[in-house]
From Swiss-Prot:
Its EC number is 6.3.2.8. Cell wall formation. Pfam families: Mur_ligase, Mur_ligase_C, Mur_ligase_M. SUPFAM superfamilies: MurCD N-terminal domain (SSF51984), MurD-like peptide ligases, catalytic domain (SSF53623), MurD-like peptide ligases, peptide-binding domain (SSF53244). It comes from Pseudomonas syringae pv. syringae (strain B728a). The lineage of its organism: Bacteria, Pseudomonadati, Pseudomonadota, Gammaproteobacteria, Pseudomonadales. It comes from the Bacteria. Belongs to the MurCDEF family. This is UDP-N-acetylmuramate--L-alanine ligase. It is found in: Cytoplasm. ATP binds at residues 123-129. It is an enzyme of class 6 (ligase).
Length: 486
């Protein structure tokens, strides 16, 4: 792929020179900012604190402000905001007062997609991995796509890149219904689950109808690629009045996986496609959920004319995405080592998928899990599901809920989760007070051969690298970006 190339700005946005991002360090914002920089626009942005992301953008020429102030918008032709930013933000308030357009990030993404062959990946779970797989397979096929992903693609070292072809591959975010701005030519729906329900006023039917509306943004000649194994996707399938291609383990799927076998990080399977020879593939990720993500990729790649050789190469050479079952390395313990894994999963279905992947790839190993729930509202709404799935670990340490800006909700916290899991009789979880150093707590619980999984969408993302650097684990082996030990 071509990285950091400079191109001419899009002619349809010729009146726009400087684009300002409010919250530029966010995972959904920085990728769009990087693509716009590489298209030749002036980009500025603000965030509450600096990070590796803002430093990277600054190295490409973006002007970065720490803190939100009215004067940051001077010279901006448009402001791009995420759903987390409201009109009380001083930069937004100033822009509105000066009649500077303020647009959601999805609207800017839609503008980038407008004159390209857009491929949008939607669904409650698996968006980031599926989008990354499609980008990797297209690159292996020589198509050099532009991509905007909600996670760091390890092979590229970034979550966004400007390619030279007509393809733009991006995640479609249902959390705030902003994916309705997008008008792709191909859309994927991986699954539909109860999450971010405040956006849909707690009405699951409204969520389902919104997904149908998203698919009807496709032109009549577009393509909806849908996972037929998901019961809700299967339910809305008859309502979709666009060409469809289904995938899954089901015998009725257009693109189907059989003979699935897992060996540690590697998953092998055979793909059946109508009017084609069976295709044997492997992917460097564990779990049936990643087989489904791969099938969505194969469906689109096949439809776009990518060769089978490129599909096999792109999947087998895939180096993963940051915080999606990311192997950080091995920690030394008495008698051997423990494999250290970090994962972003924060919904019971995602937690279950990862636990099943561990059981499938390493059936003889214990799973020691450090989990941090994300949002009090999610913990409340899915409380019983969390109790059930978290009890499947062999050893469980529960960090306090990461609030993500929410106020505490009575009963929807980790102390209560611990109590409920203990009451089930399957497990005796350990509650971790906020601010407690974890390495001294974790080490005595570990045995040689264990898998230590740190999981959640909050600041637990910093735990795995901290453990690797802890003096208590001196001599730890660090994995490469491919998840292999150096």
């Amino acid at each position: 792929m071509v990285e950091n190339q400079r191109a001419m700005p899009q002619p349809e946005m010729r009146r726009i020179r400087r684009i300002h991002f409010v919250g530029i360090g966010g995972v959904g914002m920085c990728g769009i900012a990087e693509v716009l920089l590489n298209l030749g626009y002036e980009v500025s942005g603000s965030d509450l604190k600096g990070s590796a992301v803002t430093e990277r953008l600054e190295s490409f020429g973006a002007q970065i402000f720490i803190g939100h102030r009215a004067e940051n918008t001077i010279g901006a032709d448009v402001l791009v905001v995420s759903s987390a930013v409201n009109t009380s933000n001083p930069e937004v308030a100033t822009a509105l007062e000066r009649r500077i357009p303020v647009v959601p990030r999805a609207e800017m993404l839609a503008e980038l997609m407008r004159y390209r062959h857009g491929i949008a990946v939607a669904g409650t779970h698996g968006k980031t991995t599926t989008t990354s797989l499609i980008a990797s397979v297209f690159a292996a096929g020589g198509l050099d796509p532009t991509f905007v992903i909600g996670g760091r693609l390890n092979a590229a070292g970034t979550n966004a890149q400007l390619g030279t072809s007509r393809y733009l591959i991006a995640e479609a975010d249902e959390s705030d219904a902003s994916f309705l701005h997008l008008q792709p030519l191909v859309a994927v729906v991986t699954n539909i689950d109860a999450d971010h329900m405040a956006t849909y006023e707690g009405d699951f039917n409204k969520l389902k109808k919104t997904f149908v509306e998203f698919l009807h943004n496709l032109p009549f000649y577009g393509l909806a690629v849908m996972c037929i194994d998901d019961p809700v996707v299967r339910e809305i399938l008859p309502l979709v009045k666009r060409p469809t291609l289904t995938y899954g383990f089901s015998e009725s799927a257009d693109i189907r996986a059989i003979n699935v076998r897992q060996d540690g990080m590697l998953t092998f399977f055979t793909v059946l496609r109508r009017d084609r020879e069976p295709l044997d593939v492997s992917v460097n990720m564990p779990g049936n959920h990643n087989v489904l993500n791969s099938l969505a990729t194969i469906a689109i790649a096949t439809d776009e004319g990518v060769s089978d050789e490129a599909i096999v190469q792109g999947l087998s050479g895939f180096q993963g995405v940051g915080r999606r079952f990311q192997v950080y390395g091995e920690l030394p313990v008495d008698g051997g080592h423990v494999m250290l894994v970090d994962d972003y999963g924060h919904h019971p279905r995602e937690v279950a998928a990862v636990i099943n992947a561990v059981r499938g790839g390493w059936p003889d190993r214990r799973l020691v899990m450090v989990y941090q729930p994300h949002r009090f509202s999610r913990t409340r709404d899915l409380y019983d599901d969390f109790v059930q799935v978290l009890a499947d670990a062999n050893v469980l340490l529960l960090m306090e809920v990461y609030p993500a800006g929410e106020e505490p909700i009575p009963g929807a916290d980790s102390r209560n989760l611990c109590h409920s899991i203990r009451q089930s009789g399957q497990l005796d979880p350990i509650y971790i007070e906020r601010g407690v150093e974890l390495a001294p707590l974790v080490k005595p619980l570990l045995r040689a051969g264990d898998i230590l999984l740190c999981q959640g969408a909050g600041d637990i993302g910093g735990l795995a690298p901290q453990l690797l650097k802890s003096p208590l684990f001196a001599g730890a082996k660090v994995a490469s970006t491919e998840g292999k030990l150096k």
